[in-house]
């Protein structure tokens, strides 16, 4: 018999110590990785529930196992909420991750060797949009598109590439692009060559849900997203569509299960259902509006201090610092800021002279700091501290001074009060 008072602390001290150290790290460090966020205790409650015990291969009402009457309710709640939140008429909440959702789309629509137009990773795309080290770049013929000298997507070049290469699918979406994507324009280009238009909105899903960023669902044939990042739910994936036929939706479902996954993670799907409900609250819209304001506030400080921001600004939750002119590598900037308890990630910039393991830039995002209560004033102050570190990257005294300021503001604005 299992006893509810069983706990990790009494049983596995080594594991518990690492878990507790991570709790301290999250509370005492400022998190600026654009893809990270803090999920609510309600989501964590769902993920730690007895739903983790249940196998449920198949879909609500069509399971391969018995005893699924209650997990059917859980999954249907998640499906219905996803459709309502994003204005879709189809949703699959089973993908274990955003990458798994993307795998399912590729598998449903394409054959190996088909041509795909995707955003260049160095210009802000994602691994699953055609990187040669990823399944997408290995199995499909990838033609990359990118940004122009102003840092905006070059739609003329995209249209030209589409006309020349006649891809079966065009991918919209990004992991490090700070502009507004013209989804309607991309759909127009896709329609001109009879291609699928697939959008990966993983980074901006929360902004989209709150009406702060344009919704791709009315324009794309298929949309995928993660359920964490700006959406602030559990780590997982989601597939959405609107206006498609039942044959397409059946292909997508079959591509997820049994095509690429087995049993769904019902405890995570419950977490998705909670997060989707939270995203419908008025407070969530206020949060997302503040995310965008904080990112803009930080950009203004970096520009004032003489730092180059790719595209010159941001219209979402993230931006890229280009450090080429400062003769600082992304790797060194990442490490120095880390010693000041400020967490970022090194990132390639357009025409980067450095390797992806070194890079010439850092990516900065505002979802996590906004979640813990930062407003524009704190965001500007933080950006100033970061400039102090980068201006004196080898001065440990400066780094230590900034670290003490970081610890103070983290104590004032805890993640979990």
Curated annotation (Swiss-Prot):
Pathway: One-carbon metabolism; tetrahydrofolate interconversion; Amino-acid biosynthesis; glycine biosynthesis; glycine from L-serine: step 1/1
Predominant localisation class: cytoplasm
Positions of (6S)-5,6,7,8-tetrahydrofolate binding: 121, 125-127, 355-357
KW Iron-sulfur (keyword) present: no
Enzyme Commission number: 2.1.2.1
Protein's cellular compartments: Cytoplasm
UniProt keyword annotation of Zinc-finger present: no
Summary of subunit composition and partner proteins: Homodimer.
Protein family according to the UniProt entry: Belongs to the SHMT family.
Protein name: Serine hydroxymethyltransferase
Protein source organism: Yersinia pestis
Gene that encodes it: glyA
């Amino acid at each position: 018999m299992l006893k509810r008072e069983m706990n990790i602390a009494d049983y596995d001290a080594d594991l518990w110590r690492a878990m507790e150290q991570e709790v301290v790290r999250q509370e005492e460090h400022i998190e600026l990785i654009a893809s990270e966020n803090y999920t609510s205790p309600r989501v964590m409650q769902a993920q730690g529930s007895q739903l983790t015990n249940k196998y449920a291969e198949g879909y609500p009402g069509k399971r391969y196992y018995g005893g699924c009457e209650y997990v059917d309710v859980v999954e249907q709640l998640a499906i219905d909420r996803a459709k309502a939140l994003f204005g879709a008429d189809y949703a699959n909440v089973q993908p274990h991750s955003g990458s798994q959702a993307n795998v399912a789309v590729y598998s449903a629509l394409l054959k190996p060797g088909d041509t795909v137009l995707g955003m260049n990773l160095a210009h802000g795309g994602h691994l699953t949009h055609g990187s040669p080290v990823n399944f997408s770049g290995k199995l499909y013929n990838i033609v990359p598109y990118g940004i122009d000298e102003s840092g905006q997507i070059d739609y003329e070049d995209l249209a030209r590439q589409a006309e020349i290469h006649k891809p079966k699918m065009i991918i919209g979406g990004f992991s490090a692009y700070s502009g507004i994507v013209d989804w309607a324009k991309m759909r127009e280009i896709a329609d001109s060559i009879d291609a699928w238009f697939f959008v990966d909105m993983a980074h901006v899903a929360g902004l989209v849900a709150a009406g702060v960023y344009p919704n791709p669902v009315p324009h794309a044939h298929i949309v995928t997203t993660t359920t964490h990042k700006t959406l602030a739910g559990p780590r997982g994936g989601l597939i959405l569509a609107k206006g498609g036929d039942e044959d397409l939706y059946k292909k997508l479902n079959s591509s997820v299960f049994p095509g690429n996954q087995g049993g769904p993670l019902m405890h995570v799907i419950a977490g998705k259902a909670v997060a989707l409900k939270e995203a419908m609250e008025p407070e969530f819209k206020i949060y997302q509006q503040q995310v965008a304001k904080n990112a803009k506030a930080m950009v203004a400080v970096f520009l004032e201090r003489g730092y180059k921001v790719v595209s010159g600004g941001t219209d979402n939750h993230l931006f890229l610092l280009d450090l080429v002119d400062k003769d600082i590598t992304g790797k060194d900037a990442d490490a120095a800021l880390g010693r000041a308890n400020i967490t970022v990630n090194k990132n390639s910039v357009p025409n980067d002279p450095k390797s992806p393991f070194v890079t010439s830039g850092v990516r900065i995002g505002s979802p996590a700091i906004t979640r813990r209560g930062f407003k524009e004033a704190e965001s500007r102050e933080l950006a100033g501290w970061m400039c102090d570190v980068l201006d004196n990257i080898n001065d440990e005294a400066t780094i230590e001074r900034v670290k003490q300021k970081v610890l103070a503001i983290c104590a004032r604005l805890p993640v979990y009060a």
